């Protein structure tokens, strides 16, 4: 990929000057000056409408941001990803999660080999297997059908399937339950096992290498629990499958290698829900809905690859994010879905964004002198309104926020959905407009307040407004729409990493803690005091040993 220091581009210099010109302007004025601002600052793809008009941008801002994308060679970098070049250079890998959802017969090459036959073969394996689980054809060791699927994984092997199965609960097969165990804290597996019957439970062990410490610790605990009831180790093969590539370790565990679902090193963990890692999704909502998820993502892939940048949803969202991150010095972004089914959506992209773009070294190995990935967080509306929106409205920090909502609810009970959506629309309007001192004064006078009372309370009721938001409105939360939304954010993250000149597809920062944990674990088995670390770590370990007795 092209390596361009963004702050040394002509576009960046123009953006710095433009920021000085625009930083104190209010969005209220932008709307007054342009009655067609909504039309000019919104884009659509299928059933998804993205309104970015409530941002502190003008046509000039977008023009300069688009110049940055062109000057940095973004088009070429997009093509490099889709064509299978090794853009994950620190691990010498292609980045081809987009191949997993590709529709059609065109080849996709990785290291000169068309990966699509293997992708289709695993998808067919998933289709057949999930069908056998759902229809009850697959029997447990006592001849009973499977009712509960437990996915044991961590990170990308957990967060994606958790988020998607929560989002797609309305599509769940009526007799299927799905559970997820990720944390190595024994509480997670213990509380999950309490809910299960070993005769009707299927465990999916999601680990590419079949050596991931947290996952395999939980897997062996699950196997021991199962064998307490089943007795014979031969029954493991009816109740455990593997999402892995380590055939030898899978068979040693007791899993039939015919029930090993493969994925490849060009699939990053946080982009793996589209692969065999999505088997729990297919078993929960049916392969036909998993396929719709893939088709929705593919539609966004085509849009991202083909549309001009000025009409390209992921590109525009990424550029607006850079505008706030690098020029307004915003530290965080909020993702606020007004749909309870999407309650894990912010957490999923917390990993997707922060693990991808939480980097401080550029693609040449030099320390960056510009801000990179933001902190991502969020909760569903309207809960967040009664928790943290106060700071977004009146705090000292700028927090750009994405508001997402479906026009149609899966649960159209009474007035619930209209009340929910009235809050969705009201919040972005309030964040944009705010409330001036004159408006507050008029309101208080109408309420019969005395002048001295007004003087005392007025400053506290003023909202500056000018708080930026994107509104993402879609017809209904279907598998296809969800696939498009996920791919939209994936590509936004890619664009930002590309323009910041960092590697978005490795995660070396995760490794050091893992290495140290392996050194510390044997020390916790020994009763002797520890003195091999810094004073704080020694003190904490020794205090732990004392508390353990």
Curated annotation (Swiss-Prot):
Q: Which SUPFAM superfamilies match?
A: SIS domain
Pfam families hit by this protein: PGI
- BP GO terms, sorted: gluconeogenesis; glucose 6-phosphate metabolic process; glycolytic process
Major subcellular location class: cytoplasm
> CDD domains from the xrefs?
SIS_PGI_1 (cd05015), SIS_PGI_2 (cd05016)
Q: List the keywords (alphabetical).
A: Cytoplasm, Gluconeogenesis, Glycolysis, Isomerase
Q: Which reaction does it catalyse?
A: alpha-D-glucose 6-phosphate = beta-D-fructose 6-phosphate
Q: Name one GO cellular component term.
A: cytosol
| Subcellular localization | Cytoplasm
The record's top EC class is isomerase
Ribonucleoprotein is among the record's keywords: no
**Recorded GO terms, molecular function?**
carbohydrate derivative binding; glucose-6-phosphate isomerase activity; monosaccharide binding
Pathway listed for it is: Carbohydrate biosynthesis; gluconeogenesis; Carbohydrate degradation; glycolysis; D-glyceraldehyde 3-phosphate and glycerone phosphate from D-glucose: step 2/4
What EC number(s) is this enzyme filed under?
A: 5.3.1.9
Residue numbers annotated as active site: 355 (proton donor), 386, 514
Summarizing the function annotation, the protein's role is: Catalyzes the reversible isomerization of glucose-6-phosphate to fructose-6-phosphate.
Output the NCBIfam families linked to this UniProt entry: PRK00179.1 (NF001211)
Q: Which HAMAP family match?
A: G6P_isomerase
Q: Which family does it belong to?
A: Belongs to the GPI family.
Q: What is this protein called?
A: Glucose-6-phosphate isomerase
Print the organism lineage.
Bacteria, Pseudomonadati, Thermodesulfobacteriota, Desulfobacteria, Desulfobacterales
What's the name of its gene?
pgi
